Amino acid sequence: MLTYALEQILLGKHLTRTVAEEAMGEIMDGKATPAQIGAFLASLRLKGEQVEEIIGFAKAMRARAMNFPIELPGLVDTCGTGGDGSHTFNISTASAVVAAADGVRIAKHGNRAVSSKSGSADVLEALGVPVNLSPKDAADCLRATNLCFLFAPLYHQAMKHAAGPRKELAIRTVFNLLGPLTNPAGASHQLMGVYDAKLLPNVAAVLHELDVKRALVVAGSDGLDELTVTGTSHIAELRDGRILTYEIEPEQFGLRRHEKDALRGGDANENAKIIHDVFSGARGAARDIVLLNAGAILYLADRVSSIETGVIRAAELIDGGLVMRKLEHVRHIAGGMIHAS
């Protein structure tokens, strides 16, 4: 099926959902050669991935993912595509901790660095939070703290077959989109950042087809796969089965506009220090972008009625010490599970 799919793509034809699912299944099952995988990913990128294709690919990955042992209503994921080349600090990871401090249940799906110096797994480890919990321990951590980390290589072991070709291609591929679309815990609510605003309506449509109830798919005008404080943020909001697109500016939420360089991070330890400083009350660009994205999560999870009130609440959580206490709680619970195993 992969050979057939590749032939169709080279003819400029779009794949059906079924063909896409079967083709990705062959890759996930180790039935494709590295050359076939590389050609498939590169030609697909050149053609442009369509909604039905992405749905099929995501279904193939979800079918092969390790099972997460519990289902919780209102579960949120904050996971971006990466690949934006911005080298910012780990904004969505920091924002997830803020939202968890207000009682939002978050199953953060992520990995180590691919295109940056520090992935979500790297910075959490630098903050003292173990990331390689078993599914049972991760579920227990979620129950106890409202936050757990789902380490992608553990849950998506079939992805190893595509790892080599992806690394050698060294370009964005459909797998950048698929990571955020395949949360092992089946999160029903999602803040998903993408690297190109043109992807927003299609990705929102895919999330709807994958039974996500509410989503904010976002892209910064500066290329960030986050809500940004350097300029305009583009949003596709999925709610009640409908998709609404709109734009926001940082000034709408009482936030200053900053230069992109002020958001730049470094390695995991440098990014951990930035996050620790934000949680300790430091003012500036890092705080403002965390407030904006955490406020969006609180709105997404129906903790507040608007992103604006979410930003205000996020500031209260940080300044009241609740976010730092949440980080310490997660560190204690997850660390205890590692030592006990």
Swiss-Prot record:
**Biological processes, Gene Ontology terms:** L-tryptophan biosynthetic process
One annotated GO molecular function is: anthranilate phosphoribosyltransferase activity
Q: Which residues participate in anthranilate 2 binding?
A: 166
Q: Which residues bind anthranilate 1?
A: 80, 111
Q: Which SUPFAM superfamilies match?
A: Nucleoside phosphorylase/phosphoribosyltransferase catalytic domain (SSF52418), Nucleoside phosphorylase/phosphoribosyltransferase N-terminal domain (SSF47648)
The residues the record assigns to binding Mg(2+) 1 are 92, 226
Q: Which reaction does it catalyse?
A: N-(5-phospho-beta-D-ribosyl)anthranilate + diphosphate = 5-phospho-alpha-D-ribose 1-diphosphate + anthranilate
The EC number of this protein is 2.4.2.18
Q: Which cofactor does it need?
A: Mg(2+)
Highest taxon above the source species: Bacteria
Q: Which Gene3D superfamilies match?
A: Nucleoside phosphorylase/phosphoribosyltransferase catalytic domain, Transferase, Pyrimidine Nucleoside Phosphorylase, Chain C
Q: Which UniProt keywords apply?
A: Amino-acid biosynthesis, Aromatic amino acid biosynthesis, Glycosyltransferase, Magnesium, Metal-binding, Transferase, Tryptophan biosynthesis
The record lists 5-phospho-alpha-D-ribose 1-diphosphate as bound by 80, 83-84, 88, 90-93, 108-116, 120
Q: Quick one: a GO cellular component term?
A: cytosol
Specify the pathway: Amino-acid biosynthesis; L-tryptophan biosynthesis; L-tryptophan from chorismate: step 2/5
* Residues engaged in binding Mg(2+) 2: 225-226
Cofactor, free-text remark: Binds 2 magnesium ions per monomer.
Functional summary from the UniProt entry: Catalyzes the transfer of the phosphoribosyl group of 5-phosphorylribose-1-pyrophosphate (PRPP) to anthranilate to yield N-(5'-phosphoribosyl)-anthranilate (PRA).
Matches recorded under NCBIfam families: trpD
* Family membership: Belongs to the anthranilate phosphoribosyltransferase family.
Subunit details for this protein? Homodimer.
Q: What is this protein called?
A: Anthranilate phosphoribosyltransferase
Organism in which the protein naturally occurs: Brevibacillus brevis (strain 47 / JCM 6285 / NBRC 100599)
List the gene name.
Answer: trpD
